[in-house]
Amino acid sequence: MKFAIISAGEGSRLSQEGVALPKPLVQLNGVAMIDRLIQIFVRNGADKVVVIINNESPLTKEHLAKLQAEAEIPLEVVVKTTPSSMHSFYELSPYLQDDKFCLTTVDTIFREEEFSTFIETFKQSETDGYMAVTDFIDDEKPLYISTDSALDITGFHDAVSY
């Protein structure tokens, strides 16, 4: 299974709050967010990890180059500034063909045990895709979904849709 990380944002909110590091390198419990995700992906059977970063991220690019040299699995880095996460997904799409994949943003926070259950369930399914969602919103531009009674996603929205 392939895993991909969108890490091409500007991190403008963090810098406004006085955080000097780029978002992927901000530490949670002593581990950079990007490292945490890659480690979790490896523990969940990743065959390959692909990360997209923007052109204005020399520290992140340097950090990922070090990780590539030490990686247990292929780690691809795409360097391209994109206007949105959807555009970043498009840039990653050639790397994600011919297998199931998991796509996330670098600042996704979750319990590893829940994530592992989610990934294992997806691996065992015949479904085209799964999407993990939450009702907790702390984002400048959240993405909302609508579902039917079977919890199948019926739409993606920029605002709450009833």
Predicted feature residues:
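Conserved N-terminal catalytic core of the sugar/cofactor nucleotidyltransferase
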Residues: 2-5, 13, 31-103
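Conserved beta-strand segments of alpha/beta enzyme cores
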Residues: 24, 74-76, 152
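Glycosyltransferase donor-binding loop in the core domain
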Residues: 26, 84, 110
